[in-house]
Swiss-Prot record:
Observed phenotype of the null mutant: The isolated apoplastic sap extracted from the double mutant missing both NSH3 and ENT3 lacks the ability to catalyze the conversion of inosine in hypoxanthine; this double mutant is unable to grow on medium containing inosine as sole nitrogen source, in addition plants are more sensitive to the necrotrophic fungus Botrytis cinerea BMM but are resistant to the cytotoxic adenosine analog 2-chloro-adenosine (CADO) and to 5-fluoro-uridine.
Protein name: Equilibrative nucleotide transporter 3
Keyword Transport in annotation: yes
GO CC, alphabetical: plasma membrane
Inducing stimuli: By nitrogen deficiency and 5-fluorouracil plus methotrexate.
Membrane topology: Multi-pass membrane protein
Gene transcribed to yield this protein: ENT3
Length: 418
């Protein structure tokens, strides 16, 4: 009787809203550590003024993230998703705590040694990011689109949250002795606590929600082997009978999935090439001096994060959601007009125009990302949705890596840039 009940769709999608809240928190946890690094970049610029922290740290982060997701996506169908995501969140927790230890051990002093240590911790962030993002998006892609949207929204919430906290801590500690360092340490301590919360939620709460159990059982019945440990954690055993019929459980290969969704993949790549060629390096080093002083870059980062958050929830408004594949491509390509707009605004415009441009960049980044991530998996079986989610994350991280590399081009012709 229990097994038959578990196979039925949950009444009125029971547990859906709890699952959406948990997914949002898990999304926050998958990016809060890295966003903390970006948001306290003003502190690292004071400690390491000659090493271009926002650009170098991002460039260190991305090869590890991209390399890891390539390996994990290739072996996606054989990987235990539960272990994968838990390892990722635990690695985030340890790495964020190590940033505090590193700063305390060096007493906030700069130099090449502490900077190499900082880069090593950032590399571990890259490993954790690829482990969690690919695992979570793949896992949620076999469920309802609202859960994917909530997770993607959580990524943006982490940015808005870290920006708000950074502005508060900067104001609170600005006039105190060693103020920027105290604010940064408080920041990292909060991030560590959030990561610990995510470990608990994913291990003990998320797998037991009725809607999550339903979709995972459905995926298992369609041939998915990645959800077995999650089902066991929810107290559901004896899944072998669900996956024995190989004729029903044949799935498209990764190559076939990629060919069918190549436009979505390339568009994700182009979205993040455009975004990361501007954010955050350009904002910290190429926007000049304005009335806001050293608050200027922080305000720009905060505006980007806030509008990115808004953009990830605008697809909930049905008439705003773009579902036509050609329209998505046109919207993605039109964002590249922002690059010359940023260049001329930095050179000739005032801070009001720059704030407007960064808001548009964030809004379109969030909106288009969620549109693609929620539309692409529709119509596929559970194992295919999981695989497609991982493939899309490859192109997303690839776009970030390419954008970070292109961001260095802004330094050409700038005095004392290197």
């Amino acid at each position: 009787m229990a097994d038959r009940y578990e196979n039925q769709p949950p009444e009125k999608l029971q547990g859906k809203y709890q699952a959406m809240v948990v997914c949002c928190i898990l999304g926050i946890g998958s990016l809060v550590s890295w966003n903390s690094m970006l948001t306290i970049a003003d502190y690292y610029y004071k400690v390491f003024p000659d090493y271009h922290p926002s650009r170098v740290l991002t460039l260190v982060y991305q090869p590890f993230a991209l390399g890891t997701i390539l390996i994990l996506a290739y072996h996606e169908s054989k990987i235990n998703t539960r272990k994968r995501n838990l390892i990722g969140y635990i690695l985030f927790t340890i790495s964020t705590f190590l940033l505090i230890v590193l700063d305390l051990a060096t007493k906030g002093r700069g130099g090449i040694g502490p900077y190499i240590g900082l880069c090593a911790v950032v590399a571990s962030f890259g490993l954790a990011d690829a482990t969690v993002q690919g695992g979570m998006i793949g896992d949620l892609s076999l469920m309802c689109p609202e859960l994917v949207q909530s997770f993607m929204g959580g990524l943006a919430v982490s940015g808005a949250l870290t920006s708000a906290l950074r502005l508060i801590t900067k104001a609170a500690f600005e006039k105190t002795n060693d103020g920027p360092r105290k604010g940064a340490m408080m920041f990292l301590a909060i991030s560590t606590c959030i990561e610990l919360l995510c470990v608990f939620l994913y291990a003990y709460v998320f797998p037991k929600l009725p809607i999550v159990k339903y979709y995972r059982r459905k995926a298992a019945s369609e041939g998915s082997k990645t959800v077995s440990a999650d089902l066991a954690a929810a107290g559901i055993q004896n899944q072998s009978d669900l996956t024995d019929d190989d004729s029903k459980n044949q799935r498209l290969s990764n190559k076939e999935l990629l060919i069918q969704n190549i436009d979505y993949a390339v568009n994700l790549f182009l979205i993040y090439v455009c975004t990361l060629s501007i954010f955050p390096g350009f904002l910290y080093e190429n926007t000049g001096q304005h009335g806001l002083g050293d608050w200027y870059a922080l305000v720009l980062v905060a505006m980007y994060n806030c509008w990115d958050l808004v953009g990830r929830y605008t697809p909930l408004v049905k008439w705003l959601k773009i579902e036509n594949r050609k329209l998505i491509t046109i919207a993605v390509l039109s964002r590249y007009l922002l690059i010359p707009a940023f260049y001329f605004t930095a050179k000739y415009g005032d801070q009001g125009w720059m704030i407007m441009l960064i808001s548009v960049l964030g809004l379109t980044n969030g909106h288009l990302t969620v549109c693609i991530m929620t539309i692409a998996p529709k119509g596929y079986k559970g194992p295919e949705q999981n695989a497609l989610g991982n493939l899309l994350v490859i192109f997303l991280l690839g776009g970030i890596f390419a954008g970070v590399a292109l961001d260095w081009l802004w330094l050409i012709g700038k005095k004392n840039a290197f």
